[in-house]
Amino acid sequence: MKRIIRISFTDAEATDSSSDEDTEERGGASQTRRRGKRLVKEIVIDPSDSADKLDVCKTRFKIRIPAEFLKTAKTEKKYRGVRQRPWGKWVAEIRCGRGACKGRRDRLWLGTFNTAEEAALAYDNASIKLIGPHAPTNFGLPAENQEDKTVIGASEVARGA
């Protein structure tokens, strides 16, 4: 036989109506009675849990998540500086927060791309050109045989220098 534990309590802060509706119902009286919601929660204990196995301190309640919520979870890899538009295109941008850009715009637009990897590569190239070889990137540093290792400004990155 299953055992059911009912916990009932009144939440004085929860109401179904606003305070304006309360005063209208009472004919505009200045005294308002504070109403709350009476809530009842039930916990079902399965008889298969014997009294020997059931330790109150170690009992854990399982939370069941419906499968439909698990399906909507995104499993795609996220890249730094890359986001997806609602219609499926990928965009890359460098954001400068808290004055890190020193007089530059807050957001440096890098473009729109068909895949997340293309957008991440554009971010990496611009980040290395803008910040230098120690810039945070998605794929690590490019090959060492690049002839141009100079750090350039944001306007040159935006023009595609």
From Swiss-Prot:
Keywords: Activator, DNA-binding, Ethylene signaling pathway, Nucleus, Transcription, Transcription regulation. SMART domains: AP2. The keyword DNA-binding applies. It comes from the Eukaryota. Residues 78-140 bind DNA. Pfam families: AP2. GO terms for cellular component: nucleus. Disulfide bonds: none annotated. PROSITE patterns: AP2_ERF. One of its GO terms (biological process) is ethylene-activated signaling pathway. Coiled coil: none annotated. Probably acts as a transcriptional activator. Binds to the GCC-box pathogenesis-related promoter element. May be involved in the regulation of gene expression by stress factors and by components of stress signal transduction pathways. Belongs to the AP2/ERF transcription factor family. ERF subfamily. This is Ethylene-responsive transcription factor ERF070. It comes from Arabidopsis thaliana. The gene is ERF070.
